[in-house]
């Protein structure tokens, strides 16, 4: 690809997963080009230009042109690859091999398995499914609140998830948290129900790199 930047990031304008990869790239000052495939979220098979790089046909996928066009997909794996390879000063990550490093992995896995699927299923049933079964909506809403409860319990005792500083672990939760609390959950007051988690989330969202990326997303969505 001829854009001259180190990375190509396959993403989706409204969806959260590509954007939290962009958060990490931006935090580390790494150059990247967003590519938005014509992805139908209701289709079982992704477009050919995406399947070429990700056999699962979903975003995100990342090409590292500085590493022989190495391709990696799944947002948690991508973020771990980026910080392990490029965050040599440990600005937003912990040193491999340390106990804190594995705690960081723990939270990345929890985000990928505990936050993303439940939050994503609520979006699916609330926005795309032809029927709106209340029992299903309640199921995923309750799971989302359970995840927030896990975060609330931990963050009530410490400022950040691991390492006494904001890391890739904290940042990985941000895009889904913002989307679900501002556009999907009904009759939900984040600050009232989970005040510590809401405060933590706002601190992450206010970081210059995060704000820059999220503002870019807003502009793209406004353009249609």
What are these regions (language model features)?
Residues 39-41, 166, 219:
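Positions that flank functional sites
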Residues 83, 176-177, 214:
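Active-site-flanking alpha-helical
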Residues 52, 206, 215:
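Phosphate-coordinating loops and pocket residues in cytosolic domains that bind phosphorylated ligands
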Residues 107-202, 206:
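GST-like fold's C-terminal all-alpha helical module
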Residues 77, 196, 209:
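Residue-level recognition of oxygen-bearing side chains
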Residues 210-224:
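C-terminal helix/juxtamembrane-tail motif
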Residues 2-135:
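GST-like domain detector, emphasizing the conserved glutathione-binding G-site
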């Amino acid at each position: 690809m001829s854009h001259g930047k180190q990375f190509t990031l396959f993403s989706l304008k409204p969806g959260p997963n590509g954007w939290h990869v962009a958060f990490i790239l931006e935090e580390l000052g790494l150059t990247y080009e967003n590519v938005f495939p014509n992805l139908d979220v209701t289709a079982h098979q992704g477009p050919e230009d995406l399947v070429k790089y990700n056999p699962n046909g979903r975003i995100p996928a990342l090409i590292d042109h500085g590493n022989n066009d190495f391709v990696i997909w799944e947002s948690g794996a991508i973020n771990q690859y980026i910080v392990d390879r490029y965050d040599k000063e440990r600005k937003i990550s912990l040193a491999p091999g340390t106990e804190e490093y594995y705690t960081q992995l723990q939270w990345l896995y929890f985000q990928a398995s505990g936050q993303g699927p439940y939050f994503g299923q609520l979006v699916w049933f609330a926005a795309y499914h032809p029927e709106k079964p209340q029992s299903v909506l309640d199921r995923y809403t309750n799971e989302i609140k359970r995840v927030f409860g896990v975060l609330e319990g931990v963050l009530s005792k410490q400022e950040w998830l691991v390492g006494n500083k904001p890391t890739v672990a904290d940042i990985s939760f941000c895009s889904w948290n913002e989307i679900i609390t501002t556009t999907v959950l009904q009759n939900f007051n984040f600050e009232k129900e989970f005040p510590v988690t809401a405060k933590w989330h706002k601190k992450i969202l206010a970081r210059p790199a995060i704000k820059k990326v999220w503002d870019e997303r807003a502009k793209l969505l406004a353009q249609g």
